[in-house]
A protein has these predicted regions:
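The feature captures the beta-strand-to-loop junction immediately N-terminal to the Walker
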Residues: 58-60
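Conserved ABC transporter NBD signature motif
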Residues: 81-93
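Helix-to-loop junction immediately C-terminal to a conserved catalytic motif
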Residues: 73
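Conserved ABC ATPase "signature" region
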Residues: 128-148, 200
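A short, proline-enriched helix->beta-strand linker immediately N-terminal to the Walker B motif
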Residues: 171-175
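Conserved ABC ATPase signature
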Residues: 152-156, 160
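Short helical segment in ABC ATPase nucleotide-binding domains corresponding to the A-loop/adjacent helical element
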Residues: 113-121, 133, 137
Length: 281
């Protein structure tokens, strides 16, 4: 019989170190969300995120992950508690926070270049056209879409559309990039390619990232910490798992490390335990 006691102990040691030791930049302080019909989506959510940190959130559907990110985006507000960036309470959407959804949200009648340019023009109206064009070209090159600049969304693949969405979000230089299952609809190979590209881009920009995912392998490859949500209603942060692998990360090397599977199995066990508990109740 396989002895997992030692592995679980090691993994729990990582969880105990799951609190960021750097200066808080994005702060969720005693956050509750109750809807007008009385449904309590979130309660007592507390999380400090350092500037430039990459955070992944996992949990079952309906556990309030998107609700939490909507409050960071400014699309929604806490019923109690505060969400703040750099000491400033978030009260509305702003260009310092950009969202990339699973759906691409591109204008199909506009070219790839124009889809990015419209965002740049809206945020930097005082820059010259030459400067704005340069920003668009730089970010399209960053995601490997220089040759597709004059194509329209119906003419490109799903993976390319998501690259456009990421380029558009980063082109306005946000402080926080919010990713709501951005690769969930893509095939496995395209997903891995975009994960690699996202890490390279993040390493260059070093903006703060909050990412929702249902893919534990994706979370372990990309993130600094894994925030695991309990089931709703009244969902909260169950545990925070620190991901110890050094950067830059190599997927093959990570998957050869026994600690990778310790962490992966711990996260899976957390999700299974939550699911079983709800169904037994």
């Amino acid at each position: 019989m396989l002895n997992t006691t030692k592995n679980q102990t090691n993994t729990k040691t990582q969880i105990q170190r799951g609190k960021s030791r750097r200066q808080p930049f994005l702060v969720m302080d005693n956050v509750y969300k109750v809807y007008p019909n009385g449904y309590r989506a979130l309660e007592n959510v507390n999380l400090n995120v350092a500037e430039g940190e990459f955070i992944a959130l996992i949990g079952h559907s309906g556990c309030g992950k998107s609700t939490l990110l909507n409050m960071v985006s400014g699309f929604s507000h806490p019923s109690q508690g505060t969400v703040s960036i750099n000491g400033q309470r978030i009260t509305k959407p702003g260009p310092d926070r950009m969202v990339v959804f699973q759906g691409y949200a591109l204008l199909p009648w506009r070219t790839v270049f124009e889809n990015v340019y419209l965002a740049v023009n809206a945020v930097f109206p005082n820059k010259s056209k030459v400067e704005k064009n340069a920003i668009v070209k730089e970010h399209l090159a960053m995601v490997g879409l220089t040759e597709a600049a004059e194509k329209r969304p119906p003419q490109i693949s799903g993976g390319m559309k998501q690259r456009v969405s990421i380029a558009r979000a980063l082109a306005i230089r946000p402080k926080v990039l919010i990713l709501d299952e951005p690769f969930g609809a893509l095939d496995a190979i395209t997903k891995e390619e975009l994960q690699e590209e996202l890490l390279k881009i993040w390493n260059d920009h070093r903006c703060t990232v909050l990412m929702i995912t249902h893919d534990i392998d994706e979370a372990l490859f990309l993130a600094d910490r894994l925030v695991m949500m309990t089931n709703g209603p009244s969902a909260t942060i169950g545990e925070v798992l620190e991901i110890p692998f050094p950067r830059p990360r190599d997927r093959v090397q990570m998957m050869e490390d026994p600690e990778y599977y310790n962490l992966r199995n711990y996260a899976l066990d957390f999700l299974f335990r939550r699911f079983a508990h709800d169904h037994d109740a």
